[in-house]
């Protein structure tokens, strides 16, 4: 990976800085980003995707991300380090190079990534996916 990209990804974002400064245990999620039903948080596709075919971001570090689901597909790529996630009640540890693909409505919780951990999120609207091809990729260990 190009060194300037790596440096940029490891830079501490404003959100990460707030997580550290305020000793946050849970990442702050904008109220516009989700709908709440009972105690469940559903991340809105419009907040991230905004009519895009894919949305890519670095997952915020230094605080847990609360349990949530969404109506789009999410792929996590562990670029560096490791992170523990609870996915539909199952605990999984992602290590450098691991990819996790989650279907819509999958409930997952991300434990706080540390300074050496880089988790990349890719989000896709469901209508952009060829499900026949996806079925050949998915295995019994997929979420």
Descriptions of predicted regions:
Residues 82-84, 100, 104-110, 128-130:
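Histidine-centered metal-chelating micro-motifs
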Residues 56-58, 77, 112:
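Conserved hydrophobic "DFG−1" position in protein kinase catalytic cores
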């Amino acid at each position: 990976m190009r060194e300037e990209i790596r440096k940029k990804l490891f830079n501490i974002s404003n959100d990460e800085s707030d997580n550290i400064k305020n000793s946050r245990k849970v990442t702050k999620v904008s109220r516009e980003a989700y709908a709440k039903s009972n105690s469940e948080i559903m991340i809105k596709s419009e907040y991230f995707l905004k009519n895009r075919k894919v949305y890519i971001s670095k997952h915020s570090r230094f605080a847990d991300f609360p349990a949530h689901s969404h109506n789009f597909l999410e792929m996590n790529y562990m670029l560096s380090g490791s992170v523990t996630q609870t996915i539909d009640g199952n605990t999984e540890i992602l290590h450098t190079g691991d990819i996790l693909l989650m279907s819509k409505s999958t409930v997952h919780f991300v434990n706080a990534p540390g300074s050496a951990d880089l988790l990349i999120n890719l989000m896709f609207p469901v209508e952009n996916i060829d499900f026949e091809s996806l079925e050949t990729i998915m295995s019994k260990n997929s979420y």
